[in-house]
Amino acid sequence: MDRPLRWLAIALALFVANAQADSSVPAAPRVSASTWLLADFDSGARLAAHDAGRRVAPASLTKLMTAYLLFEKLRSGKWMLGEQINVSPRAAAQRGARIFLVPGQSVPAETLLQGMIVRSANDATLALVEHVAENERAFVVEMNHKADEFGLHGTHFVNATGLDAAGHYSTANDLLILASRLLRDFPEQYRRFAVREFAYQELKQYNRNALLWRDSSVDGIKTGRTQQAGFCLIASASRNGMRLIAVVLGAADEAGRVSASEQLLDYGFRHFETRLVMQGGEPATRVRVWMGEASELPLGLERPLFVTLPRGQHAQLHTRFDVGQLLTAPIAAGERVGFLGVALGDKPIAQVPLIALSAVDTGNILQRAFDRIQLWAQ
């Protein structure tokens, strides 16, 4: 998560924590899992959490990072969905969830991708990884570099499948960031996580995410289970334009991870709402610029700003602009020149940078002289 978004998410998390102390927002449900987290996708606000920073085995949730890198390489043209991939003996021998690949056979790349996402197949996963990288070890190096890039400081990968291994771990916090990045950066690929069944060589297998059948608002994202990890599930649901993500790790069984996810999602949708405060890249206000070719500068946000708040309180939401200094040219497009403050009633809940939406070059001698006279006269 880049710095402005992390800062905003922290501010919103603190606000939501305070809101939960209000009698209008009940405490989060007690769910049976070792660590869990509920968050809003658009605002990044954490609505409820338990031990979300603890390092645990992530099981096949690992494949979210594998998928992210595969999607990156697909977008850049390093592989294609229509090409054929030869299955290595090592890929075919993978234990755990499989689509029963045979060494030496040639399989369409898209079939392998669907097998990895829908069935969480380890043989399909490794066949893809070996195709796009020198070997699994080289691919895992890329996975850890990407984890560092995303700020996943509680995460380290040892393999691409999620099988239990010493030094292979993540946290609910980190997995939320990873899942959110995948949804945001590859919306065209995210639809694959909603596919309920997968057929290969006349064998039909089903998506292990039971919520795809139980809740029509759920459209992904991934299950996992190993002896060390227990039963895990990251579920995303969208209702009335609001998207939530629930991360449940270390449940005792399949029913436990499903129940925990359902309870968390229902709690979030029932008691919170997310509002768009301002679009990104559009003028929010205009300010005076001195010593420049132009006398006014449009200010706005880098990206859309959403806030999550207790239901029914959006009428109390208001904003203010704080530039706080005389702006003098030159000013570059994208330069941070102030802040947008957001409050709910008298409680500040967010503050994000205002940027210049256009550049203002230094004015000519006459323009600068005229502005100096105006400033002197003030």
Range-by-range predicted roles:
Residues A11, L64-A67, Q263:
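A general marker of short, structured functional hotspots
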